[in-house]
Regions:
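Acidic/histidine-rich alpha-helical segments that form the ligand environment
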Residues: 24, 79-117, 126-142
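Short, contiguous pre-domain boundary segments
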Residues: 1-6, 79-80
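A very general structural signal that marks isolated residues within well-ordered alpha-helical segments
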Residues: 27, 53, 98, 105, ...
Length: 165
C-alpha cells in the first residue's frame, strides 16, 4: 500500500478539522446563534461566517498572492430564524468540502511556492503549504477552541446540557 501524499493528508486533515467545528456549531441551541461571550466578541454565527470567509480568502490568496489577510467582524451576522443559521452551517460544510478538494488536487510545486504573507506581522514570504496550514486550518482550530469555550459558558448559564464539547 502506498503512503498518502501530502495533498491527501491535507485534505483528510481539513475534513477532520471542519467536521469537529461543525459538530460544535450544530450543538448550539436555537435562539443562541447571536450569543457572544463579550459585547465586542464575534457571535456564534459570526464565527461560522468568518470561517466561510477564511476559506474564500484562501481560494483568492492562491489565485492572487497579493490578497491581504482578513479579520473577523463582530456583528456581521444577525440570525432571526433558525433556518438562517442552518443555511449558514450548510455553507460552512460546503466551503469545507471545496477546501478539501483544493488540497486534494493542489500540485507539489504550488504547495512549495513562496508567496507574500502578511499574517501574524511577518510581512514576508511563506510557502503555500504554510499558508494553508497556519493561516487557514490552524486558524479554524483556534476559533473552534473559542466556540468550545462559548459552549461551556452557555452550559453554565443555562444549567442545561449543550451538546458534546
Amino acid at each position: 500500500m502506498e503512503s498518502p501524499t501530502q495533498q491527501q493528508n491535507l485534505a483528510e486533515f481539513s475534513l477532520a478539522v471542519r467536521e469537529s467545528s461543525l459538530k460544535r456549531f450544530r450543538s448550539i441551541p436555537p435562539g443562541m446563534e447571536n450569543w457572544r461571550i463579550t459585547p465586542k466578541s464575534m457571535s456564534i454565527a459570526d464565527l461560522a461566517e468568518h470561517l466561510i470567509h477564511t476559506d474564500r480568502w484562501l481560494f483568492r490568496k492562491l489565485d492572487d498572492p497579493t490578497v491581504q489577510a482578513i479579520s473577523g467582524n463582530p456583528g456581521e451576522v444577525n440570525i432571526v430564524m433558525r433556518e438562517q443559521y442552518d443555511v449558514l452551517i450548510t455553507q460552512l460544510f460546503e466551503s469545507g468540502q471545496r477546501r478539501a478538494e483544493l488540497f486534494r488536487n493542489i500540485k507539489d510545486e504550488v504547495l512549495s511556492k513562496r508567496i507574500f504573507d502578511d499574517h501574524y506581522g511577518s510581512g514576508s514570504e511563506s510557502s503555500v503549504w504554510w499558508i494553508c496550514v497556519r493561516a487557514n486550518l490552524d486558524h479554524e482550530i483556534h476559533h473552534r477552541g473559542a466556540l468550545a469555550v462559548y459552549l461551556r459558558v452557555l452550559k453554565e448559564i443555562n444549567g442545561a446540557p449543550i451538546g458534546a464539547v
